[in-house]
Amino acid sequence: MVKKKKNYHYSKSDTHLTVDADELSYEEYYALTHCGKKAENRKKAAQALCDYLCDKFQITHCKVWVADRMYPTRYGHTYMGLYWWWHKVITIYNNMDFMTPCTNRSFADVLLHEFMHHYDYYYLNLSDSVHSKGFYSRIRDLKAKLKKQKK
């Protein structure tokens, strides 16, 4: 029974391989990738990008919280970010180890990953946001559309 339910969530997620947007603004993504390594600056830029994406997809906004500490390790896994769907909060851990911030690119990748969970719940109305082929395809598509500059 559990296996059927798990397969259902994966197959449902895999039906959506791209995000529903033709063009996205480059400015917010650029601001995030060039905001420096301080947690306060990253929080402002991450919240601005998240607000922009929520407005673009017409979904409820979520709060971004940046923890100026090391990534937690649980059960042998390191968590760079978490999405709390019932509170609509994205948590991102700023430091790789004691007082060494992660790179801007890694920080942006974690934000897009956690935002995709929010997108799954509130735009695609999936009952569970699983790490499927479709999930990672949507992240790649979102990142490519954000990085594309208008000419």
Feature locations, PLM:
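Short, basic alpha-helical nucleic acid-contact segments in DNA-binding proteins
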Residues: 141-147
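Metal-dependent catalytic neighborhoods of phosphoester/phosphodiester hydrolases
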Residues: 128
